[in-house]
Regions:
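Short beta-strand-to-loop capping motifs
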Residues: 6-10, 48-55
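Generic solvent-exposed, charged/amphipathic alpha-helical segments
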Residues: 29, 33, 62-65
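Long, continuous compositionally biased terminal/linker segments
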Residues: 52-113
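Short hydrophobic/aromatic-rich motifs at helix boundaries and adjacent loops
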Residues: 1-2, 36
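Conserved aromatic-histidine-acidic binding/catalytic patches
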Residues: 16, 20, 42, 52-53
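Long, contiguous binding/interaction regions
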Residues: 2-6, 12-25, 29-31
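Short, glycine- and small/hydrophobic-rich beta-strand elements in well-ordered beta-sheets
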Residues: 30-50
Length: 113
């Protein structure tokens, strides 16, 4: 199973006024809705998207990653982005990859965010 946790700096989005927060989440949600991923809002405002085991969640989560890593607005306002994977073995613990830290190192869009 794969999961992806995303958190935006919602306070800064509102303060800056460049984008509408609802529109940002609508775009992000759309990346996961196509494959019926399960969306869970966390207490801290982050959103956990979990793959639907009855759909091709591998493609879904990979396409979401590939799309979001190219979005300047996402790079600017994302403050948590973690990919969880247990290699489809429910007996294994999830490994997590701090995607945001990696993108800040490797992706010029995220370098100055």
């Amino acid at each position: 199973m794969m999961k992806m946790l995303i958190k935006l700096d919602e306070e800064r989005v509102r303060r800056d006024g460049k984008y509408k927060l609802a529109d940002m989440w609508r775009v992000i949600d759309a990346k996961f809705d196509k494959y019926d991923c399960i969306k869970e809002r966390q207490a801290d405002g982050a959103v956990m998207y979990s793959g639907n085991p009855n759909r091709d969640y591998y493609t879904c989560i990979n396409l979401a990653y590939l799309t979001l890593k190219g979005q300047r607005w996402f790079a600017e306002y994302c403050n948590q982005w973690i990919w969880y994977d247990n290699d489809d073995d429910e007996a294994l613990p999830f490994q997590n990859l701090n995607v945001l830290a990696r993108e800040r190192t490797d992706n010029p869009l995220f370098a100055h965010a």
